[in-house]
């Protein structure tokens, strides 16, 4: 184990020092909800065991962003600077989600330079969960709730403070910067403190603590399952599940002109919306909720896995907690695979 222990009463001071050099994004209260936001004051940070309502996805893949601009003379606007950012307090499910987005935006046939620039300018600091939250099923997706290697530093909390485990060279450099700043309250992890970083057993395969939730077998049989129509009946097509999801990445482009300046924007979209697949001819290959809801589940559990090697559901439970119709993606997948779907 390689890392340090940060006393709990020093975490705010540590965040304040980081804010002198970096944009720090962390869980904080906003209108009563716990969300990831850019901190204006280190006292805002909330590092309890409560799950954030939204994931930090929007700080790497913004809900709306300008990607190109030019004036009437043909002058193209220069790309804006990407601030050096620390994403702090990212849960294992959201770290796994960032692996999915990285596979889609960087490791596929094309590289999304906007996502890549933000990712390269970001230091990821993970935070383990202590307990399972309502709607969560990360361990049934094969994700440990209290550990992750998909970050630069990983924090584990106990009554004394936080064990900061160094995962990457970027993480080591950050801790070296803090130490160089004269902070002497860090204790190296060694001897009796080594147990501080011991995690719950989270083995996979034959030793998995939970049965792994996935869609297997013949893809066409799942696609043609006659239960999709009944399953989708309760869906109201609001798109909340897509906007709250840490892995959803559908988007659209639109152009806007103002005072001689034209800009192209990218903004989030959702396959749950009727017009998402509407053709200019008027034809829509997904005309009803049945086709759209099936697409959402199949995309997450089958198509992304086929194309990029990951299941695009990390069991974070946000869609389960947020759906106004009470739809549960875990129950849907289990019901489809077991043939036991029932409307509750």
Language model features with spans:
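Internal helical hairpin/lid segments
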Residues: 239-256
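Iron-sulfur-associated redox domains of electron-transfer enzymes in respiratory
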Residues: 1-218
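Active-site-flanking alpha-helical
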Residues: 98, 246-250, 324
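Residue-level detector of anion-binding/catalytic polar loops
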Residues: 23, 241, 319
């Amino acid at each position: 184990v390689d890392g340090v222990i940060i006393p709990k009463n020093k975490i705010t001071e540590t965040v304040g020092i980081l804010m002198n050099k970096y944009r720090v994004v962390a869980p904080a209260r906003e209108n009563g909800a716990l969300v990831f936001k850019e901190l204006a004051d280190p006292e805002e940070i909330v590092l309890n065991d409560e799950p954030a309502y939204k994931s930090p996805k929007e700080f790497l893949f913004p809900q709306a962003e300008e990607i190109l601009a030019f004036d009437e003379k043909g002058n193209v606007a220069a790309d804006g600077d990407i601030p050096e950012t620390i994403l702090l307090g990212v849960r294992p499910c959201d770290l796994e989600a960032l692996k999915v987005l990285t596979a889609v935006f960087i490791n596929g046939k094309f590289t999304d330079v906007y996502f890549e620039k933000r990712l390269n300018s970001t230091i990821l600091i993970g935070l383990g969960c202590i307990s399972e939250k309502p709607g969560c099923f990360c361990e049934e997706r094969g994700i440990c709730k209290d550990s992750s290697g998909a970050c630069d530093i990983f924090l584990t909390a106990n009554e004394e403070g936080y064990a900061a485990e160094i995962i990457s060279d970027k993480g080591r450099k950050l801790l070296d910067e803090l130490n160089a700043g004269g902070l002497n309250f860090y204790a190296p992890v060694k001897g009796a403190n080594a147990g501080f970083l011991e995690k719950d057993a989270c083995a996979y395969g034959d030793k998995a603590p939970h049965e792994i939730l996935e869609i297997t077998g013949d893809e066409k049989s799942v696609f043609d399952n006659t239960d999709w129509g009944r399953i989708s009946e309760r869906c109201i097509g609001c798109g909340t599940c897509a906007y709250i999801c840490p892995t959803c990445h559908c988007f659209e482009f639109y152009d806007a002109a103002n005072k001689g300046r034209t800009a192209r924007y990218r903004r989030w979209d959702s396959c749950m919306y009727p017009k998402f697949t509407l053709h200019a001819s008027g034809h829509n290959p997904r005309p009803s909720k049945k086709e759209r809801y099936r697409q959402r589940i199949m995309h997450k559990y089958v198509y992304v896995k086929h194309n990029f090697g990951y299941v695009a559901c990390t069991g974070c439970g946000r869609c389960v907690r947020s759906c106004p119709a009470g739809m549960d993606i875990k129950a849907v997948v289990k019901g489809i695979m077991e043939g036991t779907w029932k409307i509750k």
